[in-house]
């Protein structure tokens, strides 16, 4: 029973999947190029599945801990999704984790239907939007799934998550795992910032985002113009849970931004979308005010969080504290978010001088300009 409970921990936003052995299924010669191992309740898994669909990369979708989840090479760290690359024969060459590096690896291996805007300035903004989706919106997703005030959402997640890998699970086992995973995930809410103190910040950011997206999507098909980019999939991953799974947040979304909900359904499978070169990404000189509004939202929420997280980790403090929209925000600092901040700075530093100046001008006054400052300068 305990082993079964432990296997179910990976099917949430903060999953820690168990590792499978080396035996079992072997790839047929004529199978797809790669296998994506993930879970329906994992926003990053659904994000990567949508990326593979849009890019029309032949792949196999396998649910973690299902009967098909056998024989894959050990991932670098025990998280999902895992992207397993086939070796062209009857086995595998490697596996990798973390959705953003996975996307960039695919950009190296496949040139068609790229997600990288051609304008390096817009490409940097896309990086920023994807990171916001991955690292800030995940707090919103976790909040609407596990915060103690959302009883229906908790009950739904507790009932459905255990069945993802085995829909024929017996009732006694299902009940025990339901209780185990619910208790564990509710106990982790404070670690990701979902507390009573932070509730107004998290929920306010969700409503503001929906409102500005309703305006943007009334004029533009994607976040950065006429074709999708990384940022579209970064937001979609979290929206796949907030819109399609969580009862409370889905009602809020339907009320505040029906266009966002339809957009998310579209992003889930863009395999039929034909790229029109005449409807490309925005350029630095043609960014609409609706995109500036999104950057301002990132600047008022995610940017102060990242800076406070960096300061807390540098000072070896057990709690980060910052002000977001006039409200005090507190949570445990996380080293991974410091890596995210450093990656943003590295991407900015790799731009040519003229492009850096263009980024600085575009971000001036949004709040995001704080992320570009050299902490040692």
Question: Model-predicted segments: where are they?
Answer:
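Intrinsically disordered, low-structural-confidence terminal and linker regions
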Residues: 2-19
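Short N-terminal edge-element motif at the start of the domain
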Residues: 189-225
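Inter-helical turn/loop segments and adjacent helix faces that build the functional surface
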Residues: 107-114, 192-197, 219-224, 246-252
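Alpha-helical packing segments of well-folded alpha/beta enzyme cores
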Residues: 44, 48, 202-209, 213-216, ...
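GST-like domain detector, emphasizing the conserved glutathione-binding G-site
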Residues: 17-172, 223, 243, 292, ...
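GST superfamily/GST-like fold recognition
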Residues: 223-243
